[in-house]
């Protein structure tokens, strides 16, 4: 039985990445043919991990990395060793973003995607900040949905999804809407059937594609973490966020420098990715 973090800690990041990518391909092979034939993107979540681990993962072919905290992402992405050793690195921000931290996030080198837009006000703030940055490319964004309805999870209610996406498309010219993201409830028993939170996100994509007149291939789904990424891919995820299975278990006792405004609910911190 694979235990998240155990094999990576014992045998190294390169071994762990190969094993994860093999499991990704196994899940793709089990995916129903009526789902979009999109190769899932692996986001290596490096929160609490040092720069040398990012560089090691990059040396083994990993290009996309994710972080949950703005300050940690800014420090890591600005690290001179990462900048020199990882010229093609792409950073995804996957944590809760408060409006007062938007300008700091926009300063992150090689920021590729913001996966957690959850309000019109946040979308407008990010759009304005990205415009001021003067980037020639639009910033890719996903809309985060709270599919489980848990108070400890961020994201907007499913019923508000379409209005926010339409606002981004119509009023945020510096942003490129690319998909939907969810965390979902933890510990779902697959013997009881597919994860209902993932099913909600699939249904929302169907609804959105009807409204936009767009094929499902144009709306990504970011769902699935270390404990459930294979199931997520099997039901349609195109973006999985995996941390401890690649980098080993995290030691949160050493992360005491995060502002209180950036701290997530305890359950989300302990179990996500």
Swiss-Prot record:
The record's section on SUPFAM superfamilies has: PLP-binding barrel
Q: Which residues carry this modification: Phosphoserine?
A: 6, 226, 244
Give the disulfide map: none
Listed Basic and acidic residues bias regions: 251-260
In the record, Phosphotyrosine modifications are located at 69
PROSITE patterns in the record, alphabetically? UPF0001 (PS01211)
Asked if the keyword Phosphoprotein belongs to this entry, the reply reads yes
Q: Which domain of life is it from?
A: Eukaryota
GO MF terms on file?
Answer: pyridoxal phosphate binding
> Where is the PTM N6-(pyridoxal phosphate)lysine found along the chain?
47
Region annotated Disordered sits at: 251-273
Q: Does the keyword Signal apply?
A: no
State the GO CC annotations: cytoplasm
Protein keywords: Phosphoprotein, Pyridoxal phosphate
List residues modified as N6-succinyllysine.
125
Q: Name one GO biological process term.
A: vitamin B6 metabolic process
Q: Tell me, what does this protein do in biology? A: Pyridoxal 5'-phosphate (PLP)-binding protein, which may be involved in intracellular homeostatic regulation of pyridoxal 5'-phosphate (PLP), the active form of vitamin B6.
Q: Which family does it belong to?
A: Belongs to the pyridoxal phosphate-binding protein YggS/PROSC family.
Quote the PANTHER family the UniProt record gives: PROLINE SYNTHETASE CO-TRANSCRIBED BACTERIAL HOMOLOG PROTEIN (PTHR10146), PYRIDOXAL PHOSPHATE HOMEOSTASIS PROTEIN (PTHR10146:SF14)
- Protein name per the record: Pyridoxal phosphate homeostasis protein
Q: Which organism is it from?
A: Bos taurus
